[in-house]
């Protein structure tokens, strides 16, 4: 895997800090840390918004049932993140998956239905409400850092 570029590092770091402040104690923000999937893989999404399980994470990484949503920043890996990873995450029950296209500066939001991501929204501005926190409106610009 090629090293993380400057835009990737900056955008994911800024969004992680923003989400940590916005969501506070409601969640744990994990940046570039493994999650454990039922297919025995442990991908490391750029940002995982997960349940606060405290010391439980000393024994295991977050499982799909502990995950509110995932965010991936993509440049060179865009095709893989939009296709292969979205199918894997949907199949294991990740409730929501966001991909930031760093080339075009837009946010692609995947939402599930029956084990597949049936909804795919592409946003360049405005606000988005995460499925797990419909009371929140997150400015798309804060996530894509445009």
List PLM regions with ranges.
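Gly/Pro/Ser/Thr-rich low-complexity, intrinsically disordered segments predominantly at protein N-termini
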Residues: 1-146
């Amino acid at each position: 895997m090629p090293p993380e570029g400057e835009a990737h590092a900056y955008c994911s770091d800024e969004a992680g800090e923003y989400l940590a402040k916005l969501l506070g104690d409601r969640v744990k923000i994990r940046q570039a840390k493994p999650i454990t999937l039922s297919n025995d893989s442990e991908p490391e999404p750029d940002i995982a918004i997960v349940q606060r399980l405290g010391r439980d994470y000393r024994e295991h990484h977050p499982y799909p049932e502990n995950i509110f949503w995932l965010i991936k920043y993509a440049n060179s890996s865009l095709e893989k993140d939009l296709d292969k990873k979205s199918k894997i995450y949907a199949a294991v029950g990740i409730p929501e998956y966001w991909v930031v296209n760093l080339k075009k500066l837009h946010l692609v939001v995947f939402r599930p239905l029956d084990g597949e991501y049936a909804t795919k929204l592409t946003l360049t501005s405005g606000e988005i409400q995460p499925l797990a926190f419909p009371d929140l409106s997150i400015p798309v610009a804060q996530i894509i850092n445009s």
